[in-house]
A protein has these predicted regions:
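Bacterial Sec-dependent N-terminal signal peptides
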Residues: 1-26
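Beta-strand-rich, non-transmembrane domain signature
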Residues: 21-214
């Protein structure tokens, strides 16, 4: 038997004191179909609850599962869609993901795989998709304990939607990384799922004053 836990934060602009709701807030329905941004998302030009936002997360979804091959591993997948609203938001197309990869090979390892991404731009009334090339992906040694996955989404400017996906494999299945329901950018939709085998028991702790559906 497996246990499924879902943490879900929907339309966090209604919850967060950092991004207060305005009286005339106009929101768009979250579109969770990865690879298929909606017309409303493509035409979005500003974010009413925080008009200073350079970009917003349209969604960030995560899913963790346990696999077994000569021992348990924990896998965590990320699916992200971000709308660039202002020129200074272009920097969010450069993504860095640190992960544990000690030089001592006798220790447990983490690795990143299944990395993909693309950008979407409206040109002459048509949605133009530009996939990320493999040469835009790199792995850098940060120190003797960590590596950093780095990649840059192409053809990004004001108005662009970027999407990316990656998967982390970890030998440290006894430790589940924290999941941040809110980031420095406004978050329209955030969801994390984990399926836990019945042989494992974890303590789940929610932090923050706002209610999160579990």
């Amino acid at each position: 038997m497996r246990k499924l836990f879902i943490l879900c934060a929907f339309l966090l602009q209604f919850l967060s004191p950092v991004y207060p709701q305005q009286a005339t807030t106009a929101t768009i329905e979250p579109n969770l179909k990865y690879g298929k941004p909606s017309k409303e998302e493509l035409s979005l030009t500003s974010y009413a609850p925080d008009t200073t936002a350079a970009a917003i997360y349209l969604f960030h979804q995560g899913q963790s599962d346990f696999i077994y091959h000569d021992g348990f591993q924990l896998t965590t997948e990320h699916w992200v869609r971000i709308k660039i609203l202002k020129p200074q938001g272009v920097s969010y197309a450069d993504v860095s993901v640190p992960y544990y990869s000690p030089t001592d090979k006798d220790e447990g390892q983490e690795r990143a795989s299944e990395i993909e991404g693309c950008s979407y731009n409206m040109e002459n009334g048509k949605c133009i998709k530009t996939p990320m090339k493999r040469e835009s992906i790199s792995f850098e040694r940060f120190n003797n304990l960590y590596k950093i996955l780095k990649f840059s989404l192409p053809a990004v400017k004001e108005g662009t939607i970027i999407e990316y996906h990656y998967k982390l494999y970890s030998d440290y299945f006894s430790h589940i990384d924290n999941w941040m329901m809110q980031e420095e950018l406004p978050m329209l939709y955030n969801q994390y799922k984990i399926t836990i085998p019945h042989v494992f028991v974890y303590n789940i702790e929610l932090r923050g004053k706002d209610y999160i559906q579990v």
